[in-house]
Amino acid sequence: MARVKRGNIARKRAKKILQLAKGYRGAHSRLFRIANQQVMKALRYSYVGRKQKKRVFRKLWITRINAASRLNGLSYSRLIHNFKKSNIELNRKMLSQIAVLDIPTFNQLIAISK
């Protein structure tokens, strides 16, 4: 059986990883093994971060809605309950935008839901 030489393939692989590790400090951007570990860790963090971003934004929207609704003497949970009863189907992102950017409209929504 013929001997398989993998010089080009190994170089390509290492180059690809080092390219991804560009901008890392010290050996993390220069040495293949360490760079490989850091790239894998970074990819793991970015994957997890994409999931966490959704949670963080939802939490932010709820906080904003709660703050705006408390100015009108309602808690967040009471407000959402009233919206459900009144068939006002706005998601939390939209409600948050309205609460921050268009306060009179938000106050009207609260008045309608009461």
Swiss-Prot record:
PROSITE patterns: RIBOSOMAL_L20 (PS00937)
Pfam family name, one: Ribosomal_L20
Main subcellular location of this protein, as a coarse class: plastid
One Gene Ontology molecular-function label: structural constituent of ribosome
Keywords: Chloroplast, Plastid, Ribonucleoprotein, Ribosomal protein, RNA-binding, rRNA-binding
GO biological process, one term: translation
Keyword Lipid metabolism: no
InterPro entries named among the record's database cross-references: Ribosomal_bL20 (IPR005813), RIBOSOMAL_L20_CS (IPR049946), Ribosomal_protein_bL20_C (IPR035566)
Compartmental location: Plastid, Chloroplast
Gene Ontology annotations for the cellular component aspect, listed alphabetically: chloroplast; ribonucleoprotein complex; ribosome
Keyword Mitochondrion on entry: no
UniProt xrefs under HAMAP family: Ribosomal_bL20 (MF_00382)
Described purpose of this protein according to its UniProt entry: Binds directly to 23S ribosomal RNA and is necessary for the in vitro assembly process of the 50S ribosomal subunit. It is not involved in the protein synthesizing functions of that subunit.
Family per similarity comment: Belongs to the bacterial ribosomal protein bL20 family.
Protein name as annotated: Large ribosomal subunit protein bL20c
Organism: Trieres chinensis
GN (gene name): rpl20
